[in-house]
Amino acid sequence: MDVSWGDLIYYLGDDPNTKAIAIYMETIGDARSFMSAASEVAMTKPIIVIKPGRTEQAAAAAASHTGSLAGRDDVLDAAFRRCGVLRVNKIREVFEIVELLGKQPRPKGKYLTIVTNAGGPGVISTDALIGSGGQLAWLSERTMQQLNQLLPPHWSHANPIDLLGDATPDTYAKAIEIAAENEYSDGILIVLTPQSMTDPTETARRIAEVSKKIMGTKPILASWMGGAGVLAGRNILDQAGIPTYDYPDSAAEMFSFMFEYSVNISQVRIIVLDIIDRIVF
């Protein structure tokens, strides 16, 4: 029986137990069927595709056991965007973005605020954010004034907001409340590193309380660094619907993926056949 990607997408789109659709794809097959189904179903359920073959060698490896030629990668990217599909590059990203979209609202823009108790992870997160298509949010004058009143004089005075190593759970909670009210921010990434004065469990508990005021307005992500030593705090955040990550750069990239998905969904429209016809399948 010949079953196309379009058939599967329509089937899973109608399945009430399926909340999101993740696809590993080596060839697109019937491009018209895929794009027609995806553009319809993506409006109600996220469709995430991991398609290897970006490099010439990987494309050749895929062709060796599928017997099909891979289409031009840039054309496939355009096709995925046109029909509201999000393409990721790693298996880990498939599951992380599905979880994130299920827990947090999509950002309205690409501007992220990073709140951290250590400068290094903030810098690494910034590189990852900008490298994946996001941008740091500008801190408004009101936001700066409120943070100046809350934090020691030698805080970073910029985004990422470095609370410094002695940040208490209450400092974290108040800083996040302030950051969430910043009109120029579309999302918040909270980073905690284990330091001598850090209480990762109580900090997570206070953030979970604050998040109730923010939920639904902009996405919140967290990176609780420290392995088993911060596990209790991570569990508290997970139960509060805040996705947690081992490393802050991964979290920053997930925010960018969320924004890309939002853009793709907003641009779903009638499929232009000349794009489909350029796909080799």
Regions found by a protein language model. Give the residues of each.
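Catalytic-core regions of core metabolic enzymes
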Residues: M1-F281
